[in-house]
């Protein structure tokens, strides 16, 4: 983008399939990522001028019209999380080397479609919008937890974004509106809520119960 004008440059790389997700590192935008309909993952370190396909890895497929998701880390260059269809394979994978290799990041999340991902500014919590509800992942506990509680609608959650100004993960649902999951806007209750000496997803679950009453 130059001023009020947006310039478009078409790349000439042939991915041999439909692109279902794209992303780039917010730390270094020259690192770009792409996921195809067949689950092939590609990464580039030179602004997309050349691409490398992850060897020996088939990632999650995508929803037939919605696509998949790539979430590059905001704090760790090379860390990339991808998500999509998880009925015959894990729905979420993570890489620490730009996609050179991946491992499953699906402990605690059911076999389902993951439509969208979002993270806090420090990446300590990852949020997932899925076909069966809203989930959160703590880097301390390393497990996904259902965060719908008793108030969240039992519905498909299509989108999620993290709104740092109000410490909230904002989810969009199918026909049931937009729901904010507030992490913390009061320093008095930040941190180790259950006093087990560890700040993890259990503290997050307690916090949402406090908010919902």
Predicted regions and their residues:
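Surface-exposed or flexible loop/turn and strand-edge residues in extracellular/cell-surface modules
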Residues: 77, 188-190, 202
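Glycine-rich, flexible loop/turn motifs
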Residues: 105, 189, 208
